[in-house]
Amino acid sequence: MNLSRNERLENNPNLNKKSIQIVSKILSQNDLKAQELREKYKQLGVYVINLMSSPGSGKTTLLESLSAFKDFTFCVLEGDLQTNRDAQRLEAKGVSAYQITTGEACHLEASMIETALCELQKQCDMQQMDYLFIENVGNLVCPASYDVGASLNIVLLSTPEGDDKILKYPTMFMCADAVIVSKADMMQYFGFSLTRVKEDLGQLKANVPLFLTSNKERESIAKVRDFIEQKRAQNYQSHHQF
């Protein structure tokens, strides 16, 4: 299942040759901008994490929980079609956040991040931050095709969504440097099979770290924090090619 971008485009029955050329050009331009962003992140000294998932899986809640660790400093770029509600939630926790509203776009692109980054820098001194989280638009499809220059890609899967999503949306989970099963305390109420998730993830992409989180269990959030800190200390850079 580990297909290159060109192979994925060529295997798409909804795209003709001309459409493939257009999409390929758009994605290539995004790649160039994403590489420029990587250099910008280095200059700012921030380690960048791209959070992806379905809507309502708990991305913002995870960030709220991480904000409780006072030695874990970060700011956030929030992606949604409309409203600044998620940015407001984080600001209420003392986190500097800038909301990107995409209109009808189902993902964030590198050019959007570039513009928003300038705005975020007006709100906070990013050189005093250890991390920048990019909370992508809630969608298990489109964000998997657009590089935003992040060093670490984390995908959330919430228990109410069901345990069958990994092989249904393989392109998304192929992006993952780690997978978080969120709302894990509700697993029993939804008949969610952790065994199935592990098997499907192992079939798709072996050795991907898997975390179970619950907003009620601080230790589960601490494990995610520790993982991110470890990756930053290693200067880990995702090997995934969008």
UniProtKB/Swiss-Prot annotation:
Q: Which UniProt keywords apply?
A: GTP-binding, Hydrolase, Metal-binding, Nickel, Nickel insertion, Nucleotide-binding, Zinc
Binding of Zn(2+): at which residues?
106, 142
- GO BP of this protein: protein maturation
Q: Where does Ni(2+) bind?
A: 106-107, 142
> What Pfam families does this protein map onto?
cobW
Q: Where is this region: G-domain?
A: 48-211
Describe what happens without this gene.
Strains missing this gene do not produce hydrogenase or urease; addition of Ni(2+) to cell cultures compensates only poorly for this loss of function. Normal amounts of apo-urease are produced by the cells.
The protein's job, in short, is: Involved in the maturation of [NiFe] hydrogenases. Required for nickel insertion into the metal center of the hydrogenase. Exhibits a low intrinsic GTPase activity, which is essential for nickel insertion.
The text of the family note is:
Belongs to the SIMIBI class G3E GTPase family. HypB/HupM subfamily.
Name the chain's protein: Hydrogenase/urease maturation factor HypB
Supply the source organism for this entry: Helicobacter hepaticus (strain ATCC 51449 / 3B1)
Q: What is the lineage of its organism?
A: Bacteria, Pseudomonadati, Campylobacterota, Epsilonproteobacteria, Campylobacterales
Gene expressing this chain: hypB
